[in-house]
């Protein structure tokens, strides 16, 4: 196994551990902290903070700390959110949500930069297309990462399953899109579990999050340590402002502007499943203790399809996969418009998340890979833009979650999906007419001379902004 592959696995399993905790907690927020919409508002604050941090933090942190330590520091911000849920209140939830959000964009930008550099270098070493290796690395990452939903949701369902309640039949009429009640209303079987069970779950999540930090800090190679050290010692205020503005400078590229709807839609579709489907369908008709089991189906489907699509892309191309994802989401949204959820239709509760997992696997793996391919010379700024616009989709969706009807939310998501496919296909057409040059070995090398103690030729440097 090459060092690049080993590092990809370390990053992947580190994220698996971290998001076993955060992913499970996010799926429960709309049901666990339903009072006055506090749960979804906290999620909105998270992604608003991610937007703010995307404007300047990722390039600055990555250039100064390197990818590894940016990931480690940012992981600590995620663990803080689990602590905030131990005593849920407006002050504790909103403050820890903001902390998590500030670490969110650097975390994902550093991860994407790490995988993209590794894929390009591995491709150069074995005389393969860099974009094929990037697709494979993102496929491996999301295959491992998306399985976090299995373990996080399994933990929540097993723990909360000790305190089950039967849904009154008269409450079932309020599930789905058939009625349009004030979303602040606690409907169906959304009673909060006992404090003892909640604290037990949060204790497990905190422990897993801390384990993720230790795992990455110990086993992940610091591939750009020397470049980060040189950057800190030789660059001054001018470079700070250049780095600060790098995210915004990239917006002058029309390709990035055309990818904004696609990136925002990723936020819309993820927030719908975690915020609307779990609350208005699963919790309402089956009870909060079943949210985890249903979301396990999504996570398993997402994980397997992420790995498969990452490898399949080199044979089918991106366009076919994006069209497949759009068709799946279109059919799912239309189905949710007309489906009346009932406990007797148990299998259907699992069908929608399974289909959603297939589509989301495409949105995640292929959009990340597309950014890495189109903006190879500005990866840090490109992935910062990715997180910023995806987070804006989350913010908008979570912000209106408690104010408009569920059917209206579905129509909005469908409109964004239509715009997404139009702009994305134009980007692909432009890429076909004017292909982006492949990254070369010389471009990947740092400007400074190679150090004598660089024994491993797989260790690669971070590209320059």
UniProtKB/Swiss-Prot annotation:
Record has Membrane as a keyword: yes
Protein's name according to its UniProt entry: Protein unc-93 homolog A
UniProt KW Magnesium keyword: no
Residue positions with a glycan: 183, 189, 237
Organism classification: Eukaryota, Metazoa, Chordata, Craniata, Vertebrata
Family the entry assigns: Belongs to the unc-93 family.
Membrane topology: Multi-pass membrane protein
GO CC annotation terms, alphabetical: membrane
Membrane-spanning parts: 8-28, 40-60, 71-91, 96-118, 140-160, 200-220, 256-276, 281-301, 319-339, 343-363, 410-427
Pfam families assigned: UNC-93
UniProt keywords, alphabetically: Glycoprotein, Membrane, Transmembrane, Transmembrane helix
Localization of this protein: Membrane
Organism per entry: Danio rerio
Gene3D superfamilies (UniProt xref): MFS general substrate transporter like domains (1.20.1250.20)
């Amino acid at each position: 196994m090459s060092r690049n592959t080993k590092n990809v696995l370390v990053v992947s399993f580190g994220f698996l551990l971290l998001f076993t905790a955060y992913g499970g907690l996010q799926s429960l927020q709309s049901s666990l902290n339903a009072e006055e919409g506090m749960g979804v508002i906290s999620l909105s604050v998270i992604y608003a903070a991610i937007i703010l941090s995307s404007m300047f933090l990722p390039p600055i942190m990555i250039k100064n700390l390197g990818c590894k330590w940016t990931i480690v520091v940012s992981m600590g911000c995620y663990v803080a959110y689990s602590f905030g849920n131990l005593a849920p209140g407006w002050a504790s939830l909103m403050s820890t949500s903001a902390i998590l959000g500030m670490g969110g964009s650097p975390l994902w930008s550093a991860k994407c930069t790490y995988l993209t550099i590794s894929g390009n270098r591995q491709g150069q070493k074995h005389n393969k297309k860099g974009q094929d290796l990037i697709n494979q690395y993102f496929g491996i990452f999301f295959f491992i990462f998306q399985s976090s939903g299995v373990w996080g949701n399994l933990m929540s369902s097993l723990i909360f399953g000790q305190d089950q309640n039967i849904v009154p039949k008269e409450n079932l009429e309020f599930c789905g899109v058939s009625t349009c009640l004030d979303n602040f209303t606690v409907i169906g079987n959304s009673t909060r579990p006992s404090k003892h069970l909640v604290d037990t779950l949060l204790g497990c999540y905190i422990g897993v999050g801390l384990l993720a930090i230790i795992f990455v800090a110990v086993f992940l190679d610091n591939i750009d340590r020397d470049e980060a050290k040189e950057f800190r010692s030789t660059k001054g205020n001018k470079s700070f402002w250049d780095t600060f503005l790098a995210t915004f400078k990239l917006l002058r590229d029309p390709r990035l502007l055309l990818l904004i709807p696609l990136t925002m839609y990723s936020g819309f579709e993820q927030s719908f499943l975690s915020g609307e489907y779990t609350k208005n369908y699963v919790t309402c008709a089956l009870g909060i203790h079943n949210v985890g089991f249903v979301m396990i189906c999504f996570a398993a489907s997402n994980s397997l399809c992420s790995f498969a699509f990452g490898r399949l892309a080199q044979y089918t191309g991106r366009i076919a996969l994006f069209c497949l994802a759009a068709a799946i989401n279109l059919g799912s949204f239309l189905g949710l418009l007309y489906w009346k959820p009932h406990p007797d239709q148990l299998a259907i509760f699992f069908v929608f998340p399974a289909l959603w997992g297939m589509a989301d696997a495409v949105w995640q793996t292929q959009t990340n890979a597309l950014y890495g391919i189109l903006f190879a010379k500005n990866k840090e700024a490109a992935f910062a833009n990715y997180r910023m616009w995806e987070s804006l989709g989350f913010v908008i969706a979570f912000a209106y979650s408690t104010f408009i009807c569920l059917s209206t939310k579905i129509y909005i998501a469908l409109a964004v999906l239509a715009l997404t496919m139009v702009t994305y296909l134009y980007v692909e057409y432009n890429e076909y007419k004017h292909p982006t040059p492949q990254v070369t070995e010389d471009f990947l090398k740092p400007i400074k001379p190679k150090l004598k103690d660089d024994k491993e030729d797989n260790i690669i440097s971070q590209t320059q902004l």
